Amino acid sequence: MSSGLEYQVFPDEVRTHTALHVIKGAVIRVLGEGSLWTASTYTSGKHGRLTVTCPVKPSNEQIEEIEKLSNKKISEDLRIVSKTMSRAEAEKTYGNIIYDLFPVPPEVKELILVIVYDIDGSIWNINACNKTHLPSTRFIGEIKLEKPRFRASKKLLEIPFNVNP
């Protein structure tokens, strides 16, 4: 990782929000397609929370792997692109993977897609999102996951995290 000065260029909120996209990619790869859908997100300063669908409680080892994989992707300096597309074109090109459980209103006809490209050029994460994002994962800093909360009755996994420095 680089010195802490590099991270001060971008607001904590932007770094933390961008981290959500990196963590989501890791969650899908570690926990599988059952955790594809985001139910909610939260960011405040250097703290964030990602809530995803999850059919079964993950093991401690799986949570550790999500953190490890997320930080690996940060160190790989993955490129992040925001692309504006018509909703129809975005849905035709990428399907419903661009959406979360909370719907985009039907009157929205143009979407901003945030694409995190993996080191091999494939898509690590893609999502319709109108927030500000970093140009690269290297500016995020280190992700430290906190104790997750599995809500069995709703089949949801809440993953709180902090971004350091």
PLM regions: where:
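Active-/binding-site microenvironments in catalytic and ligand-binding cores
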Residues: 1-165
